[in-house]
UniProtKB/Swiss-Prot annotation:
Name of this protein: Putative arsenical pump membrane protein
Lineage of producing organism: Bacteria, Bacillati, Bacillota, Bacilli, Bacillales
GO biological process, alphabetically ordered: response to arsenic-containing substance
Cell membrane keyword on record: yes
GO molecular function (one): arsenite transmembrane transporter activity
Cellular component aspect of the GO annotation: plasma membrane
CDD domains: ArsB_permease
Similarity annotation: Belongs to the ArsB family.
Organism: Bacillus subtilis (strain 168)
Localization, UniProt: Cell membrane
PANTHER family: ARSENICAL PUMP MEMBRANE PROTEIN-RELATED, TRANSPORTER ARSB-RELATED
Keyword Transmembrane annotated: yes
Gene name per UniProt: ywrK
Bilayer topology annotation: Multi-pass membrane protein
Length: 442
């Protein structure tokens, strides 16, 4: 327990920008030395974590390739162009962009990509600090919560899928509609909450993405030469269609029993090969841009949680929660979703969802109850965790990026928004999940 809490403190604190994989590794070594996890357990952990890590890493590599030829700047310029000088339209389009980035990539990648671009756009528009906050806050909340509809947008969701033995296709069939309704509900709440602070008109802007290109504002540097303007839109639409095809292929692979990580790797390889041929950009940049630490972080965090599991922590949770969730599907849905939300805000959603999933596997429940508890846990982990900034790694990354660019949104300002938005959204989404599963899957 001590190793877990010390590790979480350093992950939240991150002194001098310390990579989160480093304290997680030291924590895992402490657990191994204490004997809470055996060498045999490491092999089982590897089988659970490797596939999810490869899938997420392949997606991040695709994001790096897309950034290198200006795809995201092009998207941002189109967003501004379509807003047509309206701050209201820009709000809705910003949230749509953040949603799509998470759906096509993943939540952490979406934050890394959209936050610097939004900061650049908002600075370019000359908005005041109180006018920027609605776009930045709604963007991070929607980008992070958008990992709920499909399992491949969050590494912990993928790991939990493997633990519970549920395929990606079934997860999406059961989860997509209720979580999308929850996201729409959240966006509407955010719009009403921020309406008075949104600028009603914006200055005129050029549509071409080169006007937005600014090296300092993006963490993935060294873009290649700009595309010829006449070919720009055609090529970008082709790339967008390809990324969409790859995402759809992941679900097709899950449905047909093909390896999902293999499909993700093939998609990344094709995009990188095309970039090399068309733009003459060597894949060497991936050696220093790719987030290789994802493997280490995912593996070592799993070791820590497995240690808690082995010393009886999940048995304790089972003794408390099994009588509650066994009562009815409604009890199972709301008790699981709310408890995972609380754990996520106390410990971060990565360990919270793993603990919840381990606890679920120890319960003797019927298949329907098991599935709805798992999905409710996802809602608590992906949406409920947003109540506090430390609830997700994505929000911590977001705050770090803001600080890098001399922007600041305090914990107080963040919580002032989320204390209203998040509990209502969690309850609404859990209600949608309960009725959706009851009507169509029972």
């Amino acid at each position: 327990m001590l190793a877990f809490f010390v590790t979480m403190i350093f992950i939240f604190w991150r002194p001098k920008g310390l990579n989160e994989a480093i304290p997680a590794t030291f924590g895992a070594l402490m657990v191994l030395l204490c004997g809470s996890v055996s060498l045999a357990d490491l092999g089982e952990i590897g089988t659970k974590v490797t596939g999810a890590s490869v899938t997420i890493l392949a997606t991040m590599i695709m994001a790096i390739a897309l950034e290198s030829f200006g795809f995201f700047y092009w998207v941002a310029a189109k967003l501004l162009q379509q807003s047509k000088g309206s701050g209201i339209k820009l709000f809705w389009l910003t949230n749509l962009l953040c949603f799509l980035m998470t759906i096509f990539l993943n939540n952490d990648g979406s934050i890394l990509i959209t936050t610097p671009i939004l900061l650049l756009v908002l600075k370019y528009l000359g908005l005041k600090k109180h006018q920027k906050a609605p776009y930045l806050l709604s963007g991070v909340l929607i980008a992070t919560a958008s990992s709920a509809p499909i399992g491949v947008s969050n590494i912990v969701n993928l790991i939990s899928l493997k633990i519970i033995g549920m395929d990606l296709y079934l997860h999406t069939a059961m989860m997509f509609v209720p979580s999308m309704m929850g996201l729409i509900f959240m966006t509407c709440l955010l719009f009403m909450f921020f309406y008075k602070r949104l600028p009603k008109s914006l200055p005129d802007i050029p549509g071409h993405f080169q006007s937005l290109r600014h090296r300092r504002y993006h963490p993935l540097h060294s873009p290649s030469a700009p595309l010829p303007e006449r070919n720009q839109t055609k090529i970008m639409l082709f790339v967008l269609a390809f990324v969409f095809l790859v995402r759809m292929s992941l679900f097709a692979a899950s449905y047909t029993g093909i390896s999902v990580p293999l499909v993700a790797v093939i998609g990344s390889f094709i995009l990188l090969s095309w970039r090399w041929i068309y733009f003459k950009t060597s894949p060497r940049d991936l050696l220093y841009k790719s987030p290789w630490h994802i493997f280490i972080f995912a593996f070592t965090m799993y070791v820590l949680i497995y240690g808690l599991h082995n010393i009886g922590f999940t048995e304790l949770l089972v003794s408390y929660f099994e009588p509650v969730v066994s009562g009815s599907l409604a009890h199972a849905t709301f008790a699981s979703g709310i408890s995972t939300s609380v754990f996520s805000n106390l410990f971060n959603n990565h360990p919270a969802l793993m603990i919840s999933t381990f606890t679920l596997t120890e319960m003797t429940l019927n298949p329907s109850t098991t599935k709805i508890i798992y999905l409710a846990n996802i809602i608590g982990s992906d949406i409920g965790s947003l109540l506090l900034p430390m609830g997700t790694l994505a929000t911590l990354i977001w705050m770090h990026i803001l600080k890098q660019h001399d922007e600041s949104i305090s914990w107080g300002e963040y919580i002032k928004t989320t204390i209203i938005i998040i509990p209502l959204t969690v309850l609404f989404t859990l209600t949608c999940l309960y009725f959706w599963i009851s009507w169509l899957f029972l």
